[in-house]
């Protein structure tokens, strides 16, 4: 006796039924036995290994779960996958626990499906893979690349207080992502980018400051919840790399601030731009890391980056009150800011700094006010409201 939980794609919701003879095609199936023993199963998916570390996903080859009642009253649980062609891999996950999931809350099975059901992302055996943009090399309808910003882990972190399975998934996934850290200390975006290649001579395996900053914040959040030591080496290696890039590649501002370019590559030809969302999020992550690790050097670097935002201040504001997206090393501003992402980054940075009476708060408040006016005039939603 027991219960099977599965995600019904056609209904867009979870279903449960008594454990017996059954066939299930779902990104995640949870089997709960009457004894309390639970199986968390991410069913097999098939990928072809493509150039530059990319994957091509074959949805028509998704695996299934088969449950069969036995004569002795037991149940056989079988995961079926497809035979593999040369150059292909398949992966699946099975977690077991002596207790059931809490279906009254937004548990980790629900979180997993959130990131898989629309086809935009997959957790694979070796990392978090997002759909490749059309200007990545290679790209295609079902092409994916390993993204440092593993947003599914954020979902598990947010459920740690109420889901017993969350800590295991956090540890497993963050440890897996740490294996992607290269000899320099960052997690590379392995595909090429036509845009970065054309504008800056930046090839495959480039450093994206935003993606790596978001991953750093995940390590910081996990360390706060799980205790120091588990991921400290990974964080310190990355922070040493970031500090070196900041020291050698920064663009100085009027009173000594440092703008940090959005991208880096050991073979880059031209220094890239700095976007406000990257700069603000990196600044906040450095403050968080400084607090966690008791590092004055990181706080000093964050202060320099914050000073760069103050120095450039009103230069970010467009005539229509929107913000420019980025600034080039020659001081030219470039349009194309996100609808609300940059506002939220400024909001989070200001919130962190608000406990102290710092003069920089005035600039952050001004930039947020201008962006807010533009968002309200154009009907943008999704921004933080404090």
Question: What are these model-derived regions, one by one?
Answer:
Residues 148-151, 165-172, 214-217, 230, ...:
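Extracytoplasmic/secreted proteins, especially bacterial periplasmic and envelope-associated proteins
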Residues 1-182, 227-229:
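Carbohydrate-recognition beta-sandwich/jelly-roll modules
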Residues 122-142, 186-208, 251-275, 318-346, ...:
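Carbohydrate-binding/catalytic loop surfaces
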Residues 108-140, 167-189, 229-255, 296-322, ...:
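Long, well-ordered core segments of solenoidal/helical folds
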Residues 183-238, 245:
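Acidic/His-rich structured neighborhood in mature extracellular/periplasmic domains
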Residues 218-232, 244, 248-257, 261-284:
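Flexible, surface-exposed loop/gating regions in the mature catalytic domains
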Residues 268-331:
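Active-site/pore-lining binding-face segments in mid-to-C-terminal subdomains
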Residues 88, 139-159, 204-223, 271-290, ...:
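Well-ordered alpha-helical segments within folded domains of soluble proteins
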């Amino acid at each position: 006796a027991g219960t099977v939980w599965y995600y019904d794609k056609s209904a867009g919701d979870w279903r449960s039924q008594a454990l017996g003879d059954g066939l299930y095609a779902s990104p995640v199936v949870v089997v709960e036995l009457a004894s309390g023993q639970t199986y968390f199963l991410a069913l097999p998916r098939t990928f072809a290994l493509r150039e530059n570390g990319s994957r091509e996903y074959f949805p028509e080859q998704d695996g299934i779960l088969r449950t069969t009642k036995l004569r002795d009253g037991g149940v056989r649980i079988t995961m079926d996958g497809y035979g593999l062609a040369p150059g292909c891999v398949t992966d699946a996950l099975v977690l077991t626990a002596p207790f059931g999931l809490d279906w009254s809350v937004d548990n980790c099975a629900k979180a997993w499906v959130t990131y898989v059901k629309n086809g935009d992302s997959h957790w694979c055996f070796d990392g978090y893979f997002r759909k490749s943009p059309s200007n990545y090399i290679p790209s295609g309808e079902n092409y994916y690349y390993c993204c440092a910003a593993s947003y599914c882990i954020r979902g598990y972190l947010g459920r740690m207080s109420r889901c017993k399975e969350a800590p295991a998934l956090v540890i497993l996934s963050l440890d897996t992502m740490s294996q992607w850290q290269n000899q320099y200390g960052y997690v590379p975006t392995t595909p090429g980018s036509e845009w970065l290649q054309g504008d800056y001579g930046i090839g495959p395996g480039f450093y994206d400051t935003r993606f790596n900053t978001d991953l750093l914040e995940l390590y910081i959040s996990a360390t706060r919840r799980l205790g120091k030591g588990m991921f400290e080496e990974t964080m310190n290696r990355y922070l040493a790399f970031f500090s070196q890039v900041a020291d050698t590649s920064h663009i100085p501002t009027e009173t000594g601030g440092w703008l940090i370019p959005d991208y880096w590559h050991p073979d880059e030809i031209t220094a890239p731009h700095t976007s406000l969302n990257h700069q603000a999020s990196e600044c906040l992550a450095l403050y968080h890391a400084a607090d966690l690790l008791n590092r004055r050097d990181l706080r000093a670097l964050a202060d320099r980056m914050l000073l760069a935002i103050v120095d450039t201040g009103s230069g970010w504001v467009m005539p229509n009150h929107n913000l420019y997206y980025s600034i080039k090393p020659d001081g030219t501003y470039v349009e194309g800011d996100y609808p609300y992402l940059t506002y939220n980054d400024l909001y989070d940075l200001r919130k962190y700094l608000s406990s102290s009476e710092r003069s920089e708060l005035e600039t952050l408040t001004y930039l947020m006010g201008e962006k807010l006016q533009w968002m309200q005039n154009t009907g943008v939603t999704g921004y933080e409201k404090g």
